[in-house]
Structures are given as structure tokens and as C-alpha cells.
Design a protein with these regions (language model features):
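Outer-membrane beta-barrel translocator/receptor signature
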Residues: 77-81, 88-97, 101-148, 159
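N-terminal periplasmic/intermembrane-space "pro-region" immediately following the signal or transit peptide
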Residues: 18-87
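Surface-exposed extracellular loop regions of Gram-negative outer-membrane beta-barrel proteins
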Residues: 114-134, 249-262, 272-303, 426-437
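Membrane-embedded beta-strands of outer-membrane beta-barrel proteins
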Residues: 111, 148-150, 197-201, 232-240, ...
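Exposed, low-structure sequence patches enriched in small/polar residues
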Residues: 92, 97-100, 128, 291-295, ...
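Outer-membrane beta-barrel transmembrane domain signature of Gram-negative proteins
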Residues: 189-200, 216-288
Length: 549
């Protein structure tokens, strides 16, 4: 009933409502301006969205552990020894005697006496004798050598002090003489005597900020025939660490200072006295990944007068790790004024009779290369360098009855490429190769007389069960051009053929202190010529025993 009354009331109220009071439906609208919506300027997002996994924050606990002292009783007892098989300690040998005999009536004797391993001292005495008695070139190709050497060194916390002395004598002949000259046969013999002595001290220190040095005094008396040369030299390298600054690290500042006094006397000629002063400062450091060494090579030359001739060359070497611990590239600049001496001439060509002591000046040397290493078993190096050399020595044959050599000097530009490779398989096998390739360009000489354009060496060493030790060596040189005659307008030339020399040997240790050795040289038995008209000995072999004590 109440719902009916409520509905009737709504109907009655609705009858009195109107939508609008006006009955006129005509309306007018005045437009003031066009409507323009205001929008935010659009901007392109340049980065891609990154979806990151939410990282929950680590809970931060505020509880504390109350410390509590725990009483412990220390118990000291001996550590029991391990039950191992006890073996006798092996004392490595340092002394031995070696005797042998060869197919060219070649006696060999060697004696090496050295102290055992010691942390305070080392000393020793060595002697070697070798002689040939062949029938080659009417026995004039034979030789006799004696070599004795002694040394003493002491080691302490301050450094190493040592003394060395040696004497070597070599008797041989001008066996490349003309067969028709009977007078020459009476005067073919030559004897080289060389006495050397050295005293040195190398300081050591475990303090990085302490200055250290390596100082040595050297003397030698070198004589061949009537030519005598004496040399007195002292040199010292002083070096120390430099604190890092800016981006430079591992700095080492050093300087090598040297004094060299040389005298030369030949027959009745006036003695030639020369002084060489050297000063080579260096600064080695690391910048980022580069290792740099920079400095100067300085030589001041006095030729017996008061006039001093200075020669200064820059030195720079930079290395860069191309591949970490595998490959490194390097390059730089070098150059130096070098002393020519009787000793260096004869050690290069012992058949020289006219001694031209004109010094050599390497004006500049540019070099670049790469070193590579594969693990601990193989390494290699490849280098190319260019040198500009003043007074480059060249050996030419004289026209005397001995067929001896003399030296002429010329300006030279030399391009050299070197390749070297070494491989080792544990102690079982070791193989090495070295090759040099040259391109010469001389100012006045048409050929690089007696200089090869290619030379190579290969060596192999093997270890078979620590009892048999074979080894193999190969040496090769390309053809060479030779000149006979001092006149620049009237001389003859020849070609020295390319050659290779193969040598092999074996050491068989059939007892712990006794071994058998065999060494064979020039296995191909080719009497090639390193120096014009001086063929080497043919096939020669020596065998014998070595006793270790």
C-alpha cells in the first residue's frame, strides 16, 4: 500500500515539470576564434628500452653476536716423517777429462777442473789442446792450438767480485800460397798469441732506491808475427730506479762510462796510440703498454794528438705487446762509432797481412721486428734493419806469393733481414734455425768482396733416455765475389761457390761418469772456400772418452 502511495506521488510531481521555459527554439552563437588544442611537443627516444631483472635488496640485520673467550690448550708435537724411499743425493759433475783421436792424425785433450756448486765461491782451471797432421796441401793446412783459462769469483750480500785470465796460442800457415814459390814455403808459418785478463765487480742490493753498478777492467795483449796490440779498458754501468710520475712507470736511469787505451806496433813503424771515451746515458720506462728505452751513444776519439773527435748518435727502442704474452713488435734507431783493431781483423780473417786500422762509423741504423712465443716450447724473431756505414771493411787478396789479404774501406748501405726460430720438446729435442739475408750498396766498389748475401745455420740436439745425446749442425753460405789486386783500375775477380757444411756427433753415456763421444765434421767432404784459395779440411772425425769426476 505504501509503495502505491509513493509511486502516485512521483507521477503527480512529474506532471508539473517542463524542459525549458522558452517556447522559441531559434538560437544564435557568436564565434570568437578557432579552437586550437595545446599539445606537449613530441620527442623521439633515442635509446632502446632495457629490461632488467629486479634486484632484491639484501636484508640488513641488526643483531650482534656477543663475543665470548674460549679457552684452548696449545699442544706441541713433532710432525711424523713421511715414509719415502731414500735415495742417494746426486752431486752434479763440474770437472772432467776428455781425450780423443781423429782420422787426420788429430790428437785432442781437454781438462776442466772446477769447484762444486757453492754459494760463496767459484773457481776453475781449463785447458784444451788440438792438432792436425794431415797430408793436405803438403801438410801446410795443419794447425796446432793451446788454450788455458783460469777464473775465480766470490759472492756476498754486497755483490760479485771476479778475476779471469786466459792464454791462447794458434799455429798455422799461409797454405793458400802459390805452388811455384819455393821461397814462400819457408815463410808460411804464423803464430797468434792472445793473453787476456779481467777483473770485475757487480754490486747488488735488495733496496729498490739504491744506486748499483757493474764495473770491469779488461786487458789483452794480442800478437801475430811482428804485429803487437795492447788494450787497456775500464767501463762501468751505473743504474738506479726512478719513482713513477705522471703516466711513466718502472723507470730506470742508467749511464755506461768507458775508457779504452789501445797501442799498436808493427815492425819498425811508429806506434799508433788511440784513446776512446764512451758515454751512453739511458732512460728505460713503461708508458701505458709501451716499453721504451731512449738515450745517446757517445764516443770521443783521440788519435794520438790533442784533437778530439766527438761522435754522437741517438738510441731509441720501443716495444709494443701485439698479443699479450705471445707476440711483440719493436722498432728503433741506433748507431755508433766503432774501434777497428788488430784482434778483430785476425779473428775475422787470420790470413790478413796488411793491418788497416781505420775505425768504422755506423752513422745510423734503423730496425724493426717482431718476436713471437708459443707456450714454453717455441719462439721466433723476424727483424729488418738498414745501416749507413762509413769505412766498411772489405777483404781483398793481395798479389804476394802467400796469397794473403788486405783491407779496403768504402761507404756502404746495408739492408739486412734476419729470421730465427727455436723449438724444444721438453729435454728430448731442441731445434734452432737462424738465417740472414743481405743487400749491399757500396759507393765505389762494384761488389761486396768476400761477403755472402745469404747465410744460414741449423742445429739439433736430442736426449734419448739420458744416455744417448746425438746432435746435428748445418751451416751454409751463398756465392761470393772475390777481388785480387790493390789497384782500382787493374784487378782480377773470381767467384767463390756457395757451400754448405754438415756436422754430426753423438755422446753415449754408458756409465754414470764415463761416456764415449764421436764428432764428424764436413760429412759431405767438400773442400769449399770461405776465403779465396784457402779450401777447408775435408771430412774429419774425432772419437774418444770423457771421464767425469
Amino acid at each position: 500500500m505504501r509503495y502505491l502511495i509513493l509511486i502516485s506521488g512521483f507521477m503527480f510531481c512529474g506532471m508539473s515539470l517542463f524542459a525549458q521555459a522558452r517556447k522559441d527554439t531559434t538560437n544564435s552563437v557568436k564565434i570568437i576564434q578557432t579552437y586550437k588544442p595545446t599539445l606537449i611537443e613530441a620527442r623521439k627516444i633515442e635509446t632502446l628500452p632495457v629490461i632488467e631483472k629486479p634486484k632484491p635488496a639484501a636484508p640488513n640485520y641488526t643483531y650482534n653476536i656477543e663475543p665470548k673467550k674460549v679457552k684452548t690448550d696449545k699442544t706441541v708435537s713433532n710432525i711424523p716423517a713421511a715414509d719415502l724411499y731414500k735415495t742417494e743425493e746426486f752431486n752434479y759433475p763440474s770437472s772432467f777429462v776428455k781425450v780423443g783421436y781423429g782420422n787426420m792424425k788429430t790428437p785432442l785433450a781437454e781438462f776442466y777442473l772446477n769447484n762444486k756448486r757453492d754459494n760463496k765461491y767459484s773457481y776453475g782451471l781449463q785447458y784444451r789442446f788440438l792438432q792436425t797432421n794431415s797430408e793436405l796441401n803438403k801438410t801446410f793446412a795443419d794447425f796446432t792450438t793451446h788454450h788455458v783459462k783460469g777464473y775465480l769469483a766470490s759472492y756476498s750480500t754486497t755483490g760479485e767480485f771476479g778475476l779471469e785470465a786466459s792464454y791462447k796460442q794458434n799455429k798455422f800457415n799461409y797454405y793458400g800460397y802459390k805452388d811455384t814459390s819455393k821461397i814462400a814455403e819457408k815463410n808460411l808459418g804464423r803464430t797468434i798469441s792472445n793473453f787476456e785478463a779481467k777483473a770485475y765487480f757487480n754490486s747488488v742490493s735488495d733496496k729498490s732506491n739504491k744506486i748499483k753498478h757493474r764495473t770491469a777492467f779488461n786487458f789483452y795483449n794480442y800478437q801475430i808475427g811482428k804485429a803487437i796490440e795492447n788494450d787497456y779498458a775500464i767501463s762501468s754501468k751505473i743504474y738506479g730506479n726512478v719513482s713513477d710520475f705522471n703516466d711513466l712507470e718502472n723507470g730506470i736511469l742508467s749511464a755506461t762510462i768507458g775508457f779504452d787505451y789501445t797501442t799498436f806496433q808493427h815492425l819498425n813503424q811508429k806506434s799508433l796510440n788511440r784513446i776512446f771515451l764512451t758515454f751512453d746515458p739511458r732512460f728505460d720506462f713503461k708508458y701505458d703498454v709501451l716499453n721504451v728505452s731512449a738515450g745517446l751513444n757517445t764516443t770521443v776519439y783521440f788519435n794520438g794528438s790533442d784533437t778530439a773527435q766527438p761522435f754522437i748518435n741517438p738510441f731509441i727502442k720501443v716495444t709494443y705487446p701485439l698479443i699479450e704474452n705471445i707476440a711483440t713488435v719493436y722498432g728503433g734507431v741506433d748507431g755508433r762509432y766503432k774501434k777497428q783493431s788488430l784482434k778483430s781483423i785476425i779473428q775475422t780473417n787470420q790470413f790478413t797481412s796488411n793491418y788497416n786500422l781505420t775505425n768504422i762509423y755506423e752513422n745510423i741504423k734503423l730496425f724493426a721486428g717482431i718476436t713471437a712465443k708459443v707456450g714454453s716450447s717455441a719462439d721466433a724473431v723476424f727483424e729488418i734493419n738498414y745501416s749507413d756505414v762509413t769505412n766498411m771493411p772489405l777483404f781483398i787478396s793481395t798479389q804476394d806469393s802467400f796469397n794473403s789479404f788486405t783491407i779496403i774501406n768504402d761507404q756502404a748501405n746495408i739492408l739486412k733481414f734476419t729470421a730465427a726460430f727455436n723449438y724444444s720438446f721438453s729435454e728430448i729435442a731442441r731445434i734452432g734455425f737462424t738465417g740472414n739475408f743481405y743487400n749491399y750498396n757500396f759507393k765505389t766498389q762494384p761488389q761486396p768482396w768476400q761477403l755472402p748475401t745469404i747465410e744460414a745455420k741449423v742445429n739439433m740436439n736430442f736426449n734419448i733416455k739420458n744416455k744417448v745425446y746425438p746432435h746435428f749442425d748445418l751451416m751454409a753460405m751463398s756465392l761470393q765475389k772475390q777481388r785480387t789486386g790493390l789497384s782500382e783500375t787493374n784487378y782480377s775477380t773470381n767467384t767463390i761457390n756457395a757451400f754448405y757444411d754438415i756436422s754430426a756427433g753423438i755422446d753415449f753415456r754408458f756409465r754414470p761418469k764415463l761416456s764415449l763421444f764421436v764428432q764428424a765434421n764436413n760429412i759431405m767432404a767438400t773442400r769449399y772456400q770461405r776465403w779465396y784459395n784457402y779450401p777447408v779440411l775435408g771430412f774429419n772425425a774425432i772419437g774418444g772418452l770423457t771421464f767425469i769426476f
